[in-house]
Amino acid sequence: MELNKTSESLFSAKIDHNHPRTEAHEPRDQREVRVFSLEGRSSTRQEKADRMPGRTSSRQESSKGSEEGAVHESTAGVSSKEEEESKGDGFFTGGNPTSGMALVETPMAVVSEAMVETSTMTVSQVDLQWVEQLVTSTVESLLVADIDGKQLVEIVLDNSNTVPAAFCGANLTLVQTGEEISVSFSNFVDQAQLTEATQLVQQNPKQLVSLVESLKARQLNLTELVVGNVAVSLPTIEKIETPLHMIAATIRHHDQEGDQEGEGRQDQHQGQHQEKKVEEAHI
């Protein structure tokens, strides 16, 4: 009996060892990892696992489903990009190619109209009628020229109530050179008119003073006044020097010296630069 028990126990032990062990349900990583090769092919960890033997059919079905989803997403993205490109091309090359330009032309027209309106308003605010009246009432003809760097203006005075009878029909010539200006009356009708004009100028020294002062206010110095062939003596106006005038003169003097020094340095620098170029050319 004891032998039978031991044999049965040994037999049962062999049977237990021969039974295959059931596989335990281990946790699985469901994350998808793609591996890209240099040849442009991509594969997932699930696809590699499916190629290995001993895998279940459920894993294969899940991998196929994921591949189909990825392909569907890629095709959808490509189709959406093509639709956007077709829409963009259609806007510029479609049935109405000038539809985009209309949006730009409308505000530009408004801006141009506004500019025209503002310019007309600024011009209308300045009253230039007095200039027209002065020219038409005193000037018969006008000549403006530039001769040898001198600005020349020649006016033929008209016969009107605003011009004295002694100067009607005479020529008034203004020649400006820098800050100096000369005035001459010529081309009188006869000698009597010339004599009358000369006496009229010489007998009114106050008007000569006001003429010189008004020209100085415009940074012009009257150097000569000639009536016919007679040079009229000009009044001398003393310059009133104030501390402000002295300061301004000092500043102008320093500015002139600085400009001269700057020009000298620039000339020296240019000379050195040219010498270097000559040396480089010789080398």
Swiss-Prot record:
Pfam families: DUF5421. Disulfide bonds: none annotated. Residues 1-10 have a biased composition (Polar residues). InterPro entries: DUF5421. Residues 14-34, 42-53, 61-71 have a biased composition (Basic and acidic residues). Residues 1-99, 255-283 are annotated as: Disordered. Belongs to the chlamydial CPn_0705/CT_671/TC_0042 family. This is Uncharacterized protein CT_671. It comes from Chlamydia trachomatis serovar D (strain ATCC VR-885 / DSM 19411 / UW-3/Cx).
